[in-house]
Amino acid sequence: MKFSHTEENRDGQHLDVLTDEENGVRIVVSRRGAELISIERINETGNWIGFLYRDGDLSVPEQGWANHATVMGYYLHRLKNGRSLYRGHEIKGGNHGFLRSKTWHLVESSTEGSGASLKYQITPDDFSATEYPLKVSVDLTYQIDADSVGVLFEFRNHEPELTAHLSFGLHPGFGATSFESFHLQMPRGLYRRYFSPGNFLSGETRELEFRGGEMPFSKNELPGSIILELVNIPRPQFSFVDPESGRWVVMNLAGVPYVTLWSDGGPFLCIEPCWGLTDAHEQRPFEKKQGIQIIPPGCELSGSFSMTPQFASCD
């Protein structure tokens, strides 16, 4: 296998470019937010084709969603009124938490063996007590392995006595020809939907025993978010397909507890693997939020998934 890792500065951002030259797969990661800004493959004519929305474009659009694959944590989506109480300590923050706004440290890059990877890190020195009051670090690794791009979160609770509570996930948006053109194939199994009018949980849920196939929701619901718990999904592979452009992404969400589907009506779909849920209209203390993840003192917590970009026929 032949891999390469290069660095470049573009539009004020420090970028890492990791390429699998044999299989024709390339990712670009910005150290600002450790955000994937590009996932590309070489097509049959030798051209690099991007799979993310606005793939590789660092400009700010005049309107609409401006990101590519936001890293979310130490909470997901929103806090009610931008604040929460964690063991009585006030936490404040904007959408999706503070990880997206930090400059991450590249602590390891590997281009040897059968896969290549980039490992980024945030430590307690990188955030304030108002952002998160406990000493918890996170490593985020992106790996190219054969045709897939793997994502691995690894949290470590450095507190000797306190249990840590947090939520995290990734917010990748996959580009389409238009909002009308894409399809999402969902696997069979038991789902639980959480309703979130106004972006916060209402307390209403609904179970769905799905036979598998085309997403059983109207696209008109996507701007309000479709939040699903993967209760019992034997083969949790989700397929995003845009027939007009021939782009197809298979997401393997084995071990992922929740997924959020969202679009603002633009030519993309976000399929967000989540370890946790958004806040509730009737807000609970941070440590008692629904879906919160728990890390005992001195222990670790990890979560992973993979994305496989492919080219589909237009049949």
Residue ranges and their predicted role:
Residues 1-69, 73-83, 90-93, 234-257, ...:
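Beta-strand-rich N-terminal accessory domains
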Residues 1-10, 87-146:
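Extended, loop-rich substrate-binding clefts of extracytoplasmic carbohydrate-active enzymes
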Residues 2, 161-165, 173-253:
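Active-site/ligand-binding surface loops and adjacent short beta/alpha elements
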Residues 18, 30, 122-166, 170-172:
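Acidic, contiguous internal or C-terminal segments within carbohydrate-active enzymes
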Residues 91, 96-109, 211-290:
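Acidic/His-leaning functional-site neighborhoods
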Residues 139-141, 290-295:
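Beta-strand-rich interaction surfaces with strong enrichment in secreted/lumenal proteins
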